[in-house]
Amino acid sequence: MAKISRQAYADMFGPTVGDRVRLADTALMLEVEQDLTTYGEEVKFGGGKVIRDGMGQSQALSKDCVDAVITNALILDHWGIVKADIGIKHGRIVGIGKAGNPDVQPNVDIVIGAGTEAIAGEGKIITAGAIDTHVHFICPQQVEEALCAGTTTFIGGGTGPVAGSTATTVTPGIWNMHRMLEAADELPINVGLFGKGTVSNPDAIREQIANGAMGLKIHEDWGATPAAIDTCMTVADEMDVQVAIHSDTLNEGGFYEATTKAIGDRVIHVFHTEGAGGGHAPDVIKSVGEPNIIPASTNPTMPYTINTVDEHLDMLMVCHHLDPAIAEDVAFAESRIRRETIAAEDILHDLGAISVMSSDSQAMGRVAEVAMRTWQCAHKMKLQRGPLEGDSELSDNTRLKRYVAKYTINPAITHGISHEVGSIEKGKLADIVLWDPAFFGVKPALVLKGGLAVYAPMGDINGAIPTPQPVHYRPMYAATGKARAATSMTFLPKAAIEAGITEKLKLTHLIGEVKGCRNIRKKDMIHNSYTPVIELDSQTYVVKADGMALVCEPLAELPMAQRYFLF
């Protein structure tokens, strides 16, 4: 039997079982757990390669073969770290296994034919597109920035650069909801909009859901009182949508205990659980210990560095329409920024106690840094806490699965869309990000939206080949023409779909139904369901989880940072 060295094999077909890959310039190491391809029968496209007529390409008609195949992909997902070919048909993932020509090759479960496009996955790491659940729709240009960083789903609210939207992720009322759904229909990204949940009249909430709100947002800037919380939660249970909350920093309507009493045993998604982004000061972080609360972070506090605290005060003043000349406004801002809880946040992520990562785009967060900040935190925690149980210095698979779940499958489960997006699994929309390992988490090599290229780095358009400088991200065909609608999805609640909102507004996006939001718990958060007893010293702000003090130092230098953005 002919043999090939492990290095030569990796160079040709990508790493296989037992091989390890460093992620960007971090201390994180990935180890391949399983290889679903067949040694000696690998498919690869190119001159003198396998995917040719009668060899790796069969005679199958389009109905019997995939529309695209990603060959020799190294998948990093919550369910595993696996080498496989990925088959895509009609914009969805239909196979994860061995691609090729079943007439001449064994073990083929993904058929390549004349109707199949080839996407080279050799040497690439594949992740699902990120789902950002805390998007302030302040400007449409956010979409380009996010797609170029691997985010393919926006959930949030807003109507543009106006005071209400720069502070709160809310698209309020029927008229605003309709206009934003129409605007989103032109965007090459999946979209779900929050209605205003801060109202004590249940009919004012019902009408927003019936007109397209896939979730509800309670925000202190509109008022986060116990009465409004109870009303919102009651209607959410009735109509099966999720509720997100930015609770009462000033403790005006009640303290933390009043909010949790109003919530009761009903599920809710708590934003920026650490507190710098807002919420009961200083103890909103206690919500990490509630079994019915799905806690999330926003990326400006992640991870804790020597600059984190200094940049937050100015950010907060701008985002919440505060006046630095008013002492009470300054005191409000300062009450939210605590070194101790920011430090604890990193450790809570590493323990799997905070389940979701998001951006808080242009409203104290950076829309293109969801994945990057997540992996920077994972790196920091490996340096400061060592390998997790089951990991080693040379393999961080447990940690990698935990962290990738925070911005893929867990936000999808939280908002009732995990049947459509959130992982590399059969049946789901083919929102897929390909990364060169050296640029993992920072700059994708290719972003697929519904199985078609949507953004990619591209060189001189008048060049003889695609690679000459200057290379920068450019929109591709899934961002163009009618393909935008055919490859992206708008998420709507059942009530809006039954009310005919799609037809009334003439929406052309694919439509995904939000469902199963109200019967979930924190225990359903994959790799991130730890629910410790949280104690907070109200004088020192030191946080304890199950009696363990959560203390760590800020980093002075991060990976995935300046060296990647020199040009």
UniProtKB/Swiss-Prot annotation:
Ni(2+) 2 binds at K217, H246, H272. Keywords: Cytoplasm, Hydrolase, Metal-binding, Nickel. Belongs to the metallo-dependent hydrolases superfamily. Urease alpha subunit family. The gene is ureC. It comes from Shewanella halifaxensis (strain HAW-EB4). Its EC number is 3.5.1.5. Ni(2+) 1 binds at H134, H136, K217, D360. Its cofactor is Ni cation. Substrate binds at H219. CDD domains: Urease_alpha. Carboxylation allows a single lysine to coordinate two nickel ions. It catalyses: urea + 2 H2O + H(+) = hydrogencarbonate + 2 NH4(+). It is found in: Cytoplasm. This is Urease subunit alpha. The modification N6-carboxylysine is found at K217. GO terms for molecular function: nickel cation binding; urease activity. Pathway: Nitrogen metabolism; urea degradation; CO(2) and NH(3) from urea (urease route): step 1/1. The active site is at H320. Binds 2 nickel ions per subunit. Heterotrimer of UreA (gamma), UreB (beta) and UreC (alpha) subunits. Three heterotrimers associate to form the active enzyme. GO terms for cellular component: cytoplasm. It holds the Pfam family Urease_alpha.
